[in-house]
Amino acid sequence: MPDSLPPGVRRRVVELASERLGVMAAEKVPPSLRKIARFAPARRAALGATPIAAALETDEAFRDEVVELVRAAFPDVVDALDEGASLPAADPSDVAAIAYLLRSEGWVDRVEQARGVE
């Protein structure tokens, strides 16, 4: 994950990944995250933020797992991002985090928009 993600976006990305990590089948959990996966959710996101962020950047299968959660939890946001639509009522950090995970077209612009409101 680029260090340039705004703090709110990075925090939301890690929260979403942490949530998914807690329910993943053990064999699908990246080796670097197996110990962290056993933590309680809040502790997992707080203490595991750096390795979770690194895994999202380097492990496409793990990011795909997180994207599966995002698609199920935020279908309207995902559809809007897929269509390139504006989301004026949505939290810019949430939108940027979801766009980053999906790597949808224009995700970098969404991150920059979130940076402007933090």
Predicted regions and their residues:
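N-terminal, leucine/charged-rich tether regions that mediate assembly and partner docking
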Residues: 1-111
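Acidic, low-complexity intrinsically disordered segments
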Residues: 110-118
